[in-house]
Amino acid sequence: MQTAIQHFQDKLSFEMDPSDLFEALAKNENVIVIDARRNFAYEKEHIPGAINLPHREMNSQTTSGFDRSALYVAYCDGIGCNASTRGALNMTRLGFNVRELIGGIEWWKLDGYQTEGANHTAGLKIGCAC
């Protein structure tokens, strides 16, 4: 039983769902959203306020001005993409506090939140059913 409890506690320590991210941003918590995809994907569509830092470019130079006290949330396209996992790993290796957005931008949109970019969506704010 204790192993299962630890597993789920650990999982919640490293992941965040779109509803929790939206709430944290709405409360102006010290959260920085990182789109870990390549620039062309970011320009097409991204979470409002997100910065684009492809996981392949994450290093001590590209993150030198980042706030070390912030919580960083990395995302990518969704479950068929591992850029957010790679980005979260890279940022963690660089000493940042990081979580991965469950489902990426696809689940962000499924929950009804708006996006920015050339193919932005207005958002419907359906909300989390959990």
Language model region names:
Residues 1-33, 39-44, 117-130:
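Flexible, polar/low-complexity N-terminal or interdomain linker segments that lie immediately upstream
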Residues 42-48, 108:
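Short loop/helix-cap segments at secondary-structure boundaries that form the rim of catalytic
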Residues 51, 68-69, 115-119:
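Short, hinge-like loop/turn segments at secondary-structure boundaries
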Residues 64-109:
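Catalytic cysteine-centered active loop of the rhodanese-like fold, especially the PTP/DSP P-loop
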